[in-house]
Design a protein with these regions (language model features):
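Acidic donor-binding loop at a coil-to-helix junction in glycosyltransferase catalytic cores
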Residues: 164-171
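Short beta-strand-to-loop acidic/aromatic patch adjacent to the donor-nucleotide binding site
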Residues: 68-79
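Catalytic beta-strand/loop signature of glycosyltransferases that borders the donor
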Residues: 103, 183-190
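Short beta-strand/loop segment that forms part of the nucleotide-sugar
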Residues: 14-27, 47-49
Length: 190
């Protein structure tokens, strides 16, 4: 399980939170398998929230609940190497004002300076220069510095649901550009 891979990290996070929606789990803890509940004994915090913001759940609630802390997000369907957190923290030490990702893609433009389709953006595993053109790919692990989003429009639920319910990476990229927040990738996948 993904949760297991986080508990086996070389560097342990201060807190591990699993955000779930009451829409998906209306009976909350009663709807969860015992193997997930067993992780609470190791320190897992299971947090139920009203709205299911799909891929946005992984950052939306944590960045608000822990705005004064660095927050690392991961996906729920990948088993991570035991140095994921350490890699992101090392990258953060070098670039404390940038969002740090284990993998990024770069926004690409055509000859008329118009955006190319997302599918044509180049994926990068290593890009040690922070840039507004880098898009953090959430599935690979992302570290958000404390208080990174000073404009709170990024947390506007109604707009997320209307415009970008299944496009969390692009929603965040738009707000990073609006707030001049650069993204950098480390050597995790090299």
């Amino acid at each position: 399980m993904v949760i297991d891979s986080i508990f086996h990290q070389k560097v342990q996070p201060g807190k591990i939170c699993l955000y779930l929606s009451k829409e998906e789990f209306p009976r909350e803890r009663q709807d969860l398998p015992k193997r997930v509940l067993d992780y609470e004994k190791l320190g897992l915090n299971i947090c139920f929230r009203e709205y299911n913001l799909m891929p946005h759940n992984k950052y939306f609630y944590a960045l608000q609940d822990f705005s004064d802390k660095c927050v690392i997000t991961i996906d729920d369907d990948i088993y991570y190497r035991n140095d994921l957190i350490n890699n992101l923290l090392e990258l953060h030490r070098k670039y404390p004002h940038s969002i740090c990702a284990n993998k990024v893609c770069q926004v690409s433009f055509d000859e008329k300076k118009k955006f190319k389709p997302y599918s044509q953006w180049k994926a990068l595993f290593y890009c040690n220069t922070p840039s507004l053109y880098n898009v953090a790919l959430g599935y690979a692990g992302v570290l958000y510095p404390a208080n990174i989003f000073y404009k709170k429009d990024v947390f506007y639920k109604k707009k997320i649901m209307e415009l970008a319910l299944k496009a969390d990476d692009l929603w965040l990229k738009a707000h990073e550009i609006l707030q001049n927040i650069e993204v950098v990738a480390g050597e995790y996948y090299c």
